[in-house]
Amino acid sequence: MTSQRKEHYGKINRDKVLGFTWDNKEYFGYEGDSLASALLANDVRIVGRSFKYHRPRGVMSCGVEESGALVTVGSGSRRDPNVRATTQELYSGLNASGQNAFPSVNFDFGGVNNYLSRFFAAGFYYKTFMGLPPFEWGKGTGIWMVFEKIIRKAAGMGKASREPDPDSYEHANDFCDVLV
């Protein structure tokens, strides 16, 4: 472990060391750590990127109110996006990665949006490319269809697995009481 940890503080079991993977890199933590505390102890500060300008985001709190440290846990059909690193318990073999960044959270090509921020007014993505004359459906909406895909891809959060769910459940709640 690194020197980022205080020796005799915290409610962790220092006798049980757990290995985990963050962005394809091996790290170690202790039983009782959250993913966020283990990353901070290993001197990992950037865990995600903001959705619009792709600015670096780190751990800012220690509970469920955390909005900057959303990560993807697992892989394949067991991939679980938008997990708060502060509430994810560390376990041996945990595979986690940052979200909303390409190729990684430390170097993100989407960060160029930060330099173009003066051209991106708040809410620009709602009606900017809707059509001509302004906001008239049917005329000029083809350009919106093109830009909508690009904007949604750039502004997305974690990506859910497209594979079938491998788990089985006791029963499925596949009905609704009220449909509007």
Predicted regions and their residues:
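Residues forming the flavin
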Residues: 1-180
